[in-house]
Structures are given as C-alpha cells and as structure tokens.
Amino acid sequence: MKKVMVVAACLALVAGAVYARKLNKEQKRLETCGVVMQEVLNIPDNIPHELLEKSECVIVIPSVRKLAFGIGASYGRGAMVCRKGAKFNGSWGAPAMYALEGGSLGFQIGGEATDLILLVMNDRGMESILSSKVKLGADASIAGGPKGRDASADTDAWMRAEILSYSRSRGLFAGVSLEGSTLRPDDEASEQVYGRSIKAKDIVRSEKMGVPATGRHFVNVLQKSAPRNESEQASNQ
C-alpha cells in the first residue's frame, strides 16, 4: 500500500512539472495576476470592499518596472477581468490581456518591481478601455484609490474618477501616479493564452467565453470577494 502511495505521489509531482513546463509566459503571467490579487486583498486596510463591489472591471499588472535606470517611463503586462452582461453587472467573466506603457512612476519605485491594480468604476471608463489604447488622465480619468477607512472620506474623488489605481511594491514606496501612461489591449498575449487570435473586446463582451485554466484563480478570487455589482448604476439597470 505504501508503495502505491509513493508511486501516486511521484506521478502527481511529474504531472505538475509537465504542466508547469507547458505553460507559456503569458499563461504564467495570468496565473500571477490571480496570486497578486489574492495577496492584495489579504492586506489590512487596502482596497475597500465597497469599491471592489462597485467596480465593473479589475486590471492587475504585476511587476511593473522602469525601462532603464534614471528614466521614469515604465512598462508592464497583465490581465483584465470584467463582469458579464451588457452593463457589466453580472458575475466575473473571462480575462483579457492588457499592457501598460509610458508615463512615469518616477523615483517612487526605484529599481523594484511594483504590482498595479486598477478598478474600472463605470461604463465610460470601460468603453474607453475596450475601444483602443487609452491615455490615462486624458482619455479616461484616473485617481489614486482610497484605502481602508479612507473610502468614505474620499467619496467625491472616487465617484468622479472612471478608474481607481492601487499599487504594491516590494521595496521603498511613496505613492504612485499613472497619469500619462497608456493602457492598451495586448491581443498577442491573449492569443497565447487562448490559443487563437481574439480581441479583448470580444473576450469581455462574450457571455459564453470559457475561463482558461490559468485564469481561474484570478476570476475565483474576484467572484468570492465581490460576487455582485453593488453600484447604484448597476442596481438601476
């Protein structure tokens, strides 16, 4: 019996290793988005639950870095998950890959990687992001999101913003600004995840798009934390 258990355990380890080797870099990146989202939600006084409930989409860009030492411009890739339905008021759907380029995180991140989390709060912000690449602060309004108990104090600020931004850094950190950055669909990365050519808007708009295995953790984390859209806009639709 012990031999059988040992053999079974070995086979499980081998299967896991084979699975890991087969994942391409974009599939691994999508898995990382789920891990980052879970870790961020575990931080005390971070993203207020009421804001996550009212969001239509969540974008996670892990490990954003400066392009070069002394240059503010940054680059990162990640994924966006939106609620299903024409008005984005259903359960969380399949992920689409996105890229963040340009702009400046300044000296706030130094040489360290920074994880970014963006909440898309209304239809205007969502339509802008789905249409094409968006310059944050110009094509879509963006503001640093309130944390924990600060949510009520900053109500006016986040109600006006189409996108709220949060960050987590493993090194010294003094805040983050995403104005001037460009957010765009990364359709080539989505193709690597889904195994076929597909655009971000088609992924998000589809009611029947299946969630790839590497994206299930990301979707499940959001579904468990904020299963329903509790915004006034959604409740009136």
What spans do the regions from the language model cover?
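Small-residue-enriched, tightly packed secondary-structure blocks
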Residues: 21-237
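Sec-dependent N-terminal signal peptides
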Residues: 4-14
